[in-house]
A protein has these predicted regions:
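N-terminal glycine-/charge-rich "phosphate-binding" loop or analogous flexible N-terminal tail
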Residues: 1-74
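Phosphate/diphosphate ligand-binding glycine-rich loop within oxidoreductases
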Residues: 75-149
């Protein structure tokens, strides 16, 4: 049995991550355990948690209650912005891979993963559209397109 732990949040739900986990090309049967990290906060409150992680790293916020127990048997961990703390990694002797669906990795204890030679995959989905939009704004402004002259 392959065990995947997923941690959803206010932007990417645990259900979405669980669906993605079931599509992975990994040994079956697959058991997915779902956690929610501050999914019940309003936008401003959630942004404060994100800001804290971005400024102080994954150890600066609480991890979901009970997750350390499930990490003991976890083969894979999938998150969005939820912290991947040193304690979570230390609790997971079977961990083969951590996946995060965002460009930044400030929410992950990268040094601990390196120490244990556990791969980290981070999916960057919006880098190209953001660059396109930025260049479009640049042209619109420098050529006065928005002002029609």
């Amino acid at each position: 049995m392959t065990k995947v732990v997923v941690v959803g949040d206010g932007l990417v739900s645990a259900e979405t991550l669980a669906e993605a986990a079931l599509e992975l090309n990994i040994e079956e049967p697959v058991e997915v355990t779902k956690y929610h990290w501050y999914a019940d906060l309003n936008k401003e409150q959630f942004q404060e948690k994100i800001k804290l992680i971005e400024q102080k790293g994954p150890e600066s916020v609480e991890i979901p209650a009970g997750i350390l127990d499930d990490m003991k048997e976890a083969d894979y961990l999938l998150v969005h912005i939820a912290p991947v703390s040193k304690a979570m990694i230390e609790a997971a002797p079977r961990l083969k891979l951590v996946g995060t669906c965002r460009g930044g990795i400030e929410h992950v204890a990268v040094e601990e993963l390196k120490k244990r030679q556990i791969p980290l995959i981070h999916v960057i989905r919006n880098a190209e559209p953001v660059a396109d939009f930025t260049l479009g704004l640049f042209y619109a402004l420098t050529r006065n397109i928005a002002f029609s002259y």
